[in-house]
Regions:
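Short, solvent-exposed loop/turn and secondary-structure capping segments
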Residues: 11-15, 26, 51-56, 75-80, ...
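Active-site-adjacent alpha-helix of alpha/beta-hydrolase-fold enzymes
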Residues: 57-136
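Noncatalytic modules at the cell exterior or secretory-pathway interfaces
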Residues: 390-401
Length: 427
């Protein structure tokens, strides 16, 4: 099933209703569908315009692909991310879910009818259409991903799976744009998803313990859309302060997860195992402790319209020249052997990408913040750590550590940490 906008939400609801025996809002209405629905594609979908039995639409054991454009002036928040999170894999079959977030895509150009005017006439004249991809380019993204998704899910062609795991595999096939993708399959074994309780030292995996040191920010919280509405997804925010040269030795900031048991999909860690997590730049500023009151005063003045214009320009220039955040991943085996690699070795942290939907100077009252944190899935093969550190035995892995000793200070959002079978699983 494929749906666009409200049709994207409807496709997911149909996927749920297909397996129900009665209508959730009136049990007197019986269902007898049982179609062979194996895959759902949602293009810039809405979410929870209809809530079966007053609840968000649940979905399980089905393949799911969702698209969203960062310049969608109609569904301006990534509502499909909520359905993505709600989809669970509970049986023994192979399933996967994937999402693709494209910076210069709007709402309407994924089809040939709605076009580049997400508001319609006459108000559409104030939309920032200069930022958009050409309509054919935007539909090329859809053609490539949808055809590959159908080949994979309906024809069982596993050779297309890599493009859902990492958009860079087919970068030459896609229009010039910024892409962020997520991927999770039914081999994924979750260690931390931050949904289980309010204790920041416990993990989703029984017996696992979380610790942190020298962190300027460490909190578990609900992730928000640009509009401040809930994504219904708890994550952890981690921040570190100061220059990289100051973050060494006893001042080293890190976030650590220690496992008391082996959660590997195959029963034990191997060279083929992938360490998986989702991450995004939070775009949060860390004030120095003694400057917190001063910074708050500045924010208050800005809200009152009294900010110094020169200072504002300097801040905008600084924001524009920001380098992507950097960190390293350290794995520690049961015997204490360590293997540490930069995340850039696998994929850099995406820079903050801000959207301007209209030509008017203040659009925040309609759209909220210019930046909406969108998670990117990272896949780190344990084999790469083994290659760099021959003494490291992936089979004895017990500690995963996120180490913040590189680059500038900043705050990241982290979620869905775990392990998955290798990339050749379906090939």
């Amino acid at each position: 099933l494929i749906g666009h906008s409200r049709g994207g939400e409807a496709a997911a609801i149909a996927g749920n209703f297909n397996r129900l025996s009665r209508y959730p809002d009136d049990a007197g209405v019986t269902f007898d569908f049982d179609f062979s629905i194996k895959a759902i594609i949602a293009i810039a979908p809405s979410d929870q315009q209809y809530r079966p039995a007053g609840q968000p639409n649940p979905l399980e054991n089905i393949n799911y692909l969702v698209f969203q454009g960062a310049h969608d002036a109609d569904v301006s928040i990534f509502m499909g991310a909520r359905q993505y999170e709600r989809l669970k894999f509970t049986d023994n079959n192979y399933w996967f879910k994937a999402s693709l977030y494209t910076y210069r895509s709007n709402h309407g150009q994924f089809n040939t009818v709605w076009g580049d005017n997400d508001w319609g006439k006459p108000m559409g004249i104030i939309l920032n259409r200069k930022a958009l991809l050409d309509g054919e380019e935007q539909r090329t993204i859809g053609k490539v991903y949808i055809s590959a998704f159908l080949e994979t899910t309906l024809h069982g062609n596993g050779s297309y799976l890599p493009l859902f795991r990492d958009y860079r595999v087919i970068r030459d096939w896609l229009p010039d744009d910024i892409y962020i993708n997520r991927f999770e399959d039914s081999t994924f074994k979750r260690i931390c998803d931050f949904e289980e309780d309010v204790d920041v030292t416990t993990a989703t995996l029984a017996g696992a313990e979380i610790s942190g040191k020298n962190l300027a920010v460490w909190r578990e919280a609900d992730l928000k859309f640009r509009s401040s509405r809930t994504k219904e997804n708890n994550v952890v925010f981690l921040g570190w302060r100061g220059a990289a040269s100051e973050r060494q030795g006893d001042n080293l900031p890190y976030y650590s997860i220690e496992m008391s048991e082996n959660p590997s999909p195959g029963g034990e860690f191997s060279h083929d195992t992938l360490l998986i997590f989702s991450l995004a730049d939070a775009d949060e500023k860390i004030p120095e402790p003694e400057e917190e009151e001063i910074e708050q005063d500045k924010r208050d003045k800005k809200k009152a319209g009294k900010a110094d214009k020169k200072e504002k320009k300097e801040e905008e220039k600084e924001e524009k020249n920001k380098k992507p955040l950097q960190l390293r991943i350290e794995l520690i085996s049961e015997d204490g052997t360590k293997a540490k690699l930069s995340l850039d070795r696998f994929m850099p942290v995406h820079p903050v990408i801000k959207s301007r939907f209209t030509k008017i100077s203040n659009e925040s009252s309609r759209y909220g913040k210019a930046y909406e944190p969108t998670m990117q899935t990272y896949e780190l093969p344990l084999a790469v750590f083994k290659e760099e550190y021959p003494a490291f035995d992936p089979g004895q892995l017990r500690v995963i550590r996120f180490v913040f000793d590189l680059g500038r200070e900043g705050v990241i959002i982290l979620d869905n940490i775990g392990f998955s079978a290798g990339r050749d699983f379906l090939r």
